């Protein structure tokens, strides 16, 4: 597994620290925007989109990704984009939901490391949260994340527990976030419903906090979409519900 690779010597980045020890992107002072821009340019992102990413890196002091690694993610109704060697052509191929998720989460992990934007990845059933971008660790934390993504999914969907833990994190950061006019970004990758309680009730304490929530669905199942839309309609949250890349493209085309 990638996490067993030799540890690199980590050089601490001077970021603000919350009471629970989590580092914050304090007004973007510690970001490596040049390296982030180079990373995105190599992926052939246009300058306008790169500028949008840079703006978001400043806006969000901390990023949290909840990653659904439950057994249902092994279903083979996902989609993935495969590009040609020269990056000029791409095609959609069918894959497991987990493969679709893993490709996207890997990208966010790489961006967090390249930009040194403090980011936390929380797998529903496996291990402890992985922090990327809080120190210049030679890519060790990114390797751990990639190793987790190479494992097979299995287990249930305890979203409520993780949402409650994230709420405590945001509450611990609230004073500094408001002082800096920043927010926390929370993205939930999932293909279903919570298995450990009322998710709307778990999300409700986030109301009024400086946090934006994105639900990234890894399925086009109508019942799952209805479930999440119902939650959204009953909460006063900054919340967006997104289908896969191709579904979003079809909506705006």
Model-found features: residue ranges?
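Surface-exposed acidic, glycine-flexible loop patches that form ligand/cofactor-binding
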Residues: 52-57, 110-115, 168-180, 204-205
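Acidic, polar low-complexity linker/tail segments
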Residues: 13-90
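VWA/integrin I-like adhesion module and closely mimicked acidic/polar interface patches used
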Residues: 77, 154-157, 192-235, 242
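Eukaryote-biased feature marking scaffold/signaling PDZ-domain proteins and nuclear chromatin regulators
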Residues: 58-61, 96, 114-119, 154, ...
